[in-house]
Amino acid sequence: MPSAPQRPLFSRGSWPEARRLADVLRQETTGGLLLLVFTVIALVWANVAGNSYEEVRQFHLGPAALHLDLSIEHWAADGLLAIFFFVTGLELKKEFVAGDLRSPRAAALPIAAAVGGMAVPALLFVLVNVLHPDSPEGALVGWATPTATDIAFALGILAVVGSHLPSALRTFLLTLAVVDDLLGITVIAIFYTEQVHWTPLLLALLTLAAFTVAVQRRVRSWWLLVPLALATWALVHASGIHATVAGVLLGLVVPVLRSEEHGGPEAGPGLSEHFEHRWRPLSTGFAVPVFALFSAGVAIGGVSGFTAAVQDPVALGVIAGLVLGKPIGIVGTTWLLAKLTRAELDENLRWVDVLGMAMLAGMGFTVSLLIGSLAFGEGTAAGEHVTLGVLVGSLLSAVLAAVVLSRRNRVYRRIEAEERVDADGNGVPDVYER
């Protein structure tokens, strides 16, 4: 009996999934443009306004009795990014429960590519810092810095350069970035936790369980859910584990589908979609840009200061990981998977398209900055050099991706036009009905 034909790599998914992801991508694109603006503001502020930038971001506020007397920079990283990771948890669960990735075969490619896109940058960072004669002591602690992908920044760049990247590649990039974020937060929880305090951690599990029971029963009352979420966040923070882990866990326990008790899947979506509509605009429009404002500002010190900073092995390792490691890891893993499964690319695409998309994944901004600050601390020379390395690496990745993808824009416009044709007028483009 002949085997079923192998589905092409980067082929179109279902129309409902494509429509949902298009809405997500529009919001992420807007967030990416805001991220660009706030990053520029941070750099200008840090370099032209004396010490005011450092004074503001190191200003402490919060209840000291609860061990929450944190700097504004800490509040942005530990608090606001928890919202970002909450939305990430919602998105990831939806993809694997109700999205096109509920099929193990479909999920294998983005997961494998995300792993390859993390392993190779980490390896390059380690190689640079092991082989460089001037590598500072303890530099290897930053190995995970260049392993992340910032989807909002990548889509913001796409909006600026006007690329018409096909929906299948955009979807793959989004899914890869979401998996990347989950792997990144796992790395943070495992490798960047110095000491675990078990009492608050166990209490956090209790409040998380209460939150889980509430959302499974379709409780939507903010006066109950928000205090439970805040208590979980505060207790995880007190446990010594990075507080953003709480955001992911809270997102992952929200149901995607309705239970039979509440009408089953046919009665409508679960609370996940409701929460995502409420919280994604806050994440992309406020939380992540404000985090960038208080994390991306680094005093460059003119041409000589910039040159010295990027020659630091720590910065060089980050740049090499983002610019070279990401595309090598993603394209290499994808090519290897294609060979092992004997799958072919979609007939409209070429490997250069995968390369351009992989270069976009080299924009590691948000999670890379977070890991860099955890690895090297605030206000240290290595920490500032890592920040500059992330900025330079992301910028170079954006430029290279723009060059590669812009050369294929004519093909992308043709694919985009085909995806809009609805000859029978039923509201579903014809390419999704074949």
UniProtKB/Swiss-Prot annotation:
GO CC entries: plasma membrane
Gene3D superfamilies assigned: Na+/H+ antiporter like domain (1.20.1530.10)
Alphabetical keyword list: Antiport, Cell membrane, Ion transport, Membrane, Sodium, Sodium transport, Transmembrane, Transmembrane helix, Transport
The UniProt record lists the keyword Transmembrane: yes
Chief place where the protein resides: membrane
Catalytic activity: Na(+)(in) + 2 H(+)(out) = Na(+)(out) + 2 H(+)(in)
InterPro entries given in the database record: Na/H_antiporter_dom_sf, NhaA
Gene Ontology terms, MF aspect: sodium:proton antiporter activity
Domain of life where this protein originates: Bacteria
Keyword Magnesium: no
Recorded topology in the membrane: Multi-pass membrane protein
Pfam families, alphabetized: Na_H_antiport_1 (PF06965)
Bilayer-crossing regions: 30-50, 70-90, 108-128, 141-161, 172-192, 195-215, 286-306, 318-338, 354-374, 386-406
GO biological process: regulation of pH
Subcellular locations according to the entry: Cell membrane
Reported function: Na(+)/H(+) antiporter that extrudes sodium in exchange for external protons.
Similarity section: Belongs to the NhaA Na(+)/H(+) (TC 2.A.33) antiporter family.
Descriptive protein name: Na(+)/H(+) antiporter NhaA 1
Organism: Kineococcus radiotolerans (strain ATCC BAA-149 / DSM 14245 / SRS30216)
Lineage: Bacteria, Bacillati, Actinomycetota, Actinomycetes, Kineosporiales
